Amino acid sequence: MADGIDRNADEKMEFSTSKEVTVAPTFEAMHLKENLLRGIYAYGYESPSAVQSRAIVQVCKGRDTIAQAQSGTGKTATFSISILQSVIMGLGDYMNVQCHACIGGTNVGEDIRKLDYGQHVVSGTPGRVADMIRRRNLRTRNIKMLVLDEADELLNRGFREQIYDVYRYLPPATQVVVVSATLPYDVLEMTTKFMTDPVRILVKRDELTLEGLKQYFIAIEKEEWKFDTLCDLYDTLTITQAVIFCNTRRKVDWLTDKMREANFTVSSMHGDMPQRERDSIMQDFRQANSRVLISTDVWARGIDVQQVSLVINYDLPSNRENYIHRIGRSGRFGRKGVAINFVTQEDVRILRDIELYYSTQIDEMPMNVADLLA
């Protein structure tokens, strides 16, 4: 499984697609450039995943495309292969592609220097990209494609206007590709404002809860008892790496301090931290220098760390779409994974709503949960 995709689960996936969508069984069948194929195989890919086999050809044809499938199914590589974005630089090693990450919280001068030099691919956060366009350091007249990764998040109220700002600067013929693990109906409706007759490749919702990932809840009578429950779990389980999700930055800081006071080793990350600090924390976690990371939903999307075997929702997500993104951090690359949800009486309705939305059942945590992580 060099490409990090659980092939057994992938093969069972059912899609709802536009009529013109066909399945390309191999990368060769997609008629990709020879140099790109070399990069794909050198990166460890052997054959396309279910979403890749349906979406790559459509994007390469220049069609506006909406691709939705659960975490860990190769969506990032779907558009990376199509436009040579950076899973990135690796796929373009044989093509001399210039890529730059243009993100908030980093040095503006570096962005200006790199963009003035010229880039084939720019990946970035909406605010910084819009800023670079307004400064005229990112020139848009030759842009051929706009990709919205994690589109449900980018098209929510927080980012929507920034995305529209970017889109208004682009040439009318710009191809638009929308990618996400979850695409609520209102987000799909929104795409009609800036996409032209898009091809749709959507996994059926009851497929979305990640086969092979065990989901449990622990009933906790009072909010203030969650901390003791977490400490008991921490003492009981032998984990490789774990992520604990809280709903607010303040809660992340509070829980981190409490855990450290109790002599537990943890790291933490949230959106108030400078980008450089987040990068450093992330690197430590990837290299397994830290085993437990406490975070807000800033960590819930698009981040692969192979050894994460446990996700704990200290707080259930306030947005049910975020549930699938959170638990998808565990059990990646076909490994065993467990998600444990702390549920107070006030949370029962939210838990039932999540079960209904994803057509899944979340059982009470068994006594032998440690065996499931072994």
Swiss-Prot record:
Annotated Helicase ATP-binding domain residues: 56-201
Binding locations of ATP: A69, Q70, S71, G72, T73, G74, K75, T76
Pfam families named among the record's database cross-references: DEAD (PF00270), Helicase_C (PF00271)
Compartments where found: Nucleus, Nucleolus
GO biological process: mRNA splicing, via spliceosome; rRNA processing
InterPro entries xref list: DEAD/DEAH_box_helicase_dom, Helicase_ATP-bd, Helicase_C-like, P-loop_NTPase, RNA-helicase_DEAD-box_CS, RNA_helicase_DEAD_Q_motif
Keywords of this entry: ATP-binding, Helicase, Hydrolase, Nucleotide-binding, Nucleus, Ribosome biogenesis, RNA-binding, rRNA processing
UniProt entry tagged with the keyword Endoplasmic reticulum: no
Name recorded for this polypeptide: ATP-dependent RNA helicase FAL1
Organism: Phaeosphaeria nodorum (strain SN15 / ATCC MYA-4574 / FGSC 10173) (Glume blotch fungus)
